[in-house]
């Protein structure tokens, strides 16, 4: 009888040791899974944050933004319907030390249903003492067409401005949720969040960019989704898309896109 009791006690202790060890392993696995989930969830949060605006792409008629409202917070004054800011810029280096940068900025005021902005032409030098040559040409949006308000004698430039299309007018991100294994960088103190994906030259957005811009490199680009501010939404921060085709010195080639909703400024508020 004593022998049976000893065997039973031994088995109980053995099972307890196995159970504790098993719990320890389970906890380790749970920690690993939780850590993985945190990384995955952060990537998903970044994509979901961008989806709030990217789901609207392509915005073929920019004036549709007058009827669309973005994220609102306490920064908005009473009665302010807000203003959409849209930017597309393309920069390319044709020789070391100099970057040619061109693009357009447009402010679509939902209070006045008026859109004004400018086309910019700039040369950015490594020697910062030379960086005082940006030219701006005022524009407005009428019937979904860019109207040039300044006199431009260069016919080629004039045509380029009047026929300009923002990236958001032809880009399509319906597959955004399927982007996987992004390189995620976060800084909770700023806060800022970044997801970077290696794209393929067969991607429809990449192909469209190659049709429109003088992209000479055959490199497939990296797509960067960058958030400055609260990942859940903020009128103070901003979100930026960037396609970097080359970062080699003297061959830098980048397309950047920006669409954000924020408070209207001064006289823009009714």
Curated annotation (Swiss-Prot):
GO terms for cellular component: plasma membrane. InterPro entries: Csa (IPR007595), Csa_sf (IPR038641). It is a lipid-anchor. It is found in: Cell membrane. PROSITE patterns: PROKAR_LIPOPROTEIN. A lipid is attached at residue 23 (S-diacylglycerol cysteine). Its main location: membrane. Keywords: Cell membrane, Lipoprotein, Membrane, Palmitate, Signal. The keyword tRNA processing does not apply. Residues 1-22 form the signal peptide. The keyword Cell membrane applies. It comes from the Bacteria. Disulfide bonds: none annotated. A lipid is attached at residue 23 (N-palmitoyl cysteine). Belongs to the staphylococcal tandem lipoprotein family. This is Uncharacterized lipoprotein SAUSA300_0419. It comes from Staphylococcus aureus (strain USA300).
């Amino acid at each position: 009888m004593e022998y049976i009791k000893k065997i039973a006690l031994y088995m109980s202790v053995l099972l307890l040791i196995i159970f504790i060890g098993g719990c320890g392993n389970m906890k380790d696995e749970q920690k690993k899974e939780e850590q993985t989930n945190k990384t995955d969830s952060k990537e998903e949060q970044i994509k979901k944050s961008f989806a709030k605006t990217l789901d609207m792409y392509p915005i073929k008629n920019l004036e549709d933004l007058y009827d669309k409202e973005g994220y609102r917070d306490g920064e908005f004054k009473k009665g302010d319907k807000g203003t959409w800011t849209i930017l597309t810029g393309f920069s390319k280096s044709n020789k070391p030390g100099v970057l040619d940068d061109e693009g357009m900025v447009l402010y679509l005021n939902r209070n006045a249903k008026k859109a004004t902005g400018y086309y910019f032409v700039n040369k950015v030098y490594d020697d910062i003492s030379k960086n005082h040559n940006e030219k701006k040409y005022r524009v407005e949006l009428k019937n979904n067409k860019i109207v040039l308000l300044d006199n431009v004698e260069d016919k080629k430039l004039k045509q380029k401005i009047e026929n300009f299309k923002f990236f958001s007018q032809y880009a399509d991100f319906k597959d955004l949720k399927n982007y996987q294994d992004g390189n995620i960088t976060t800084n909770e103190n700023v806060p800022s969040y970044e997801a970077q994906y290696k794209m393929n030259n067969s991607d429809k957005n990449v192909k469209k960019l190659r049709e429109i811009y003088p992209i000479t490199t055959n490199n497939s680009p990296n797509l960067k989704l960058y958030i400055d501010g609260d990942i859940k939404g903020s009128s103070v921060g901003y979100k930026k898309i960037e396609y970097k085709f080359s970062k080699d010195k003297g061959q830098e080639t980048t397309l950047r896109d920006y669409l954000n909703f924020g408070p209207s400024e001064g006289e823009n508020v009714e």
